[in-house]
Amino acid sequence: MEERVAERLHGALGPLGFEVHAFKVGWYNAVLQPAFHLPYPDDTLAFVVLSTPSMFDKALKPFVNKERLKIIRDPVDQCVSHHLSSVKEIFPDQKVDVIFDYEILPSRRPKFLAQTAAHVAGAAYYYQRKDVKLDPWGEKKIFGVCIHPKYGGWFAIRGLLLFPDVQVPFLEQSAPVDCVSTEEKRTELLELFNFHWQDGRYRDIIEVKERYSEEQKTYFSTPPAERFRLLGLTRFTE
């Protein structure tokens, strides 16, 4: 069942520059405190959805051109929401729950921890402080970061697709590729991500197959309110 679902998802989202990776809810819940658990049985089939560098041209630009007569407040979020929600149409006989990376609970917690989901699904390795044996940071708070074996840091985790009626007790877990395997490189990665994230150098911690285009880099480095003009939009398209 998982293979049939995955095949349909790849067919629908792959040409738009998205990747999907399967996991069981239980794998995710097992590594988190109960407050962060997804409220589904352990064997429930889920997929984490990533956007790759090509999503900008394959999905975002066509979406903006098609929707430019409607109100657009956040082009990327609305594009991702449109395409992930459209997945329900290819599974008319299945219940599909969609959780987006920007959604939060009333408690202000995120609805899911994106990097944990990517790690347990084998999509991208989540490097954290505990992965560095000789910790040089003392009392400083250090955030972890996912690195994709093909795109390095040039990707984003966009959401989850959950299939509450599909149980996959025999799904085998794939470990993420440990592509930043040395102590020195892991330290450098966390240093760059935590203290120099704006220059984007952490994204190239490994040799990547594809990165954001110059146009895309400019778009994401521009303050959100000013991004509209880069896509030929006014602040709110009416």
Curated annotation (Swiss-Prot):
Keywords: Cobalamin, Cobalt, Cytoplasm, FAD, Flavoprotein, FMN, NADP, Oxidoreductase, Phosphoprotein, Transferase
Coiled coil location: none
Record GO cellular component, one term: cytoplasm
Residues bound to substrate: D101, F112, L113, A114, Q115, Y126, Y127, Q128, C146, I157
Compartmental location: Cytoplasm, Cytosol
Protein function: Cobalamin (vitamin B12) cytosolic chaperone that catalyzes the reductive decyanation of cyanocob(III)alamin (cyanocobalamin, CNCbl) to yield cob(II)alamin and cyanide, using FAD or FMN as cofactors and NADPH as cosubstrate. Cyanocobalamin constitutes the inactive form of vitamin B12 introduced from the diet, and is converted into the active cofactors methylcobalamin (MeCbl) involved in methionine biosynthesis, and 5'-deoxyadenosylcobalamin (AdoCbl) involved in the TCA cycle.
Family: Belongs to the MMACHC family.
Protein name: Cyanocobalamin reductase / alkylcobalamin dealkylase
Organism: Gallus gallus (Chicken)
